Amino acid sequence: ERSREKRKSSNGFQLGLIGYTNAGKSTILNQLTQAGTYQMDQLFATLDPLTRQVDLFPNFEVTLTDTVGFIQELPTTLIHAFESTLEESADVDLLVHVVDASNAQFSLHEKTVIDLVNDLEMQEIPMVTVYNKTDLIEGEFQPNLYPSIQISAVNEADVERLKAFLKEQVKAQMTYYEEWLDVTQTKELNQLQQRTLVESLNYDEEKNQYC
């Protein structure tokens, strides 16, 4: 039995990183993919979208795209660059909303992002929230959005927890179904393993087929 994403994609499953600027999206992308992107602590550190493969499953391809950070009252000179980079997120299977949980204005930042997602007619794309920079928080943190996870992207154990969280969220966007393949259809089997998540692979001797 294997599973297939609800949103069709010829390139496996696509994750799109979004969030208010300086939330730590590029750091998360680097930690998950070793992409080596520019990640200085400043506004608009990412102006060009960057897509890399993230190793969540053995064969199934999952990609992660970083985009320019959202901001209130975006300067006119950056509107075009902002819109063009967000086009990279318009066709993703799952939005990963990164929030700087240590910022006192994090709730306002969340609202800014959600409002812009709605304005761009991307609200139907499933979204999960990653509350980042929890190592900088004093006291208890109360998240506003769910499903969500609280991490510090510079903590190795937290990065592993994030990977496990994303794996479960990817699976949650999929529909299970069963398919039979003849033993001679090795090319088709390889393609399925790359483009879908194979939960189990069995061989039926009587039918001489894989299931």
Specify the residue positions occupied by each region the protein language model found.
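Conserved G1/Walker A P-loop phosphate-binding module
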Residues: 1-79, 86-90
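Conserved phosphate/pyrophosphate-binding and hydrolysis machinery centered on Walker-type P-loop NTPases
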Residues: 11, 37, 103-106, 178-182
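Conserved RecA-like P-loop NTPase ATPase core
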Residues: 28, 66, 85, 96, ...
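Amphipathic alpha-helical transducer elements in NTP-driven molecular machines
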Residues: 79-82, 86-89, 107-111, 124, ...
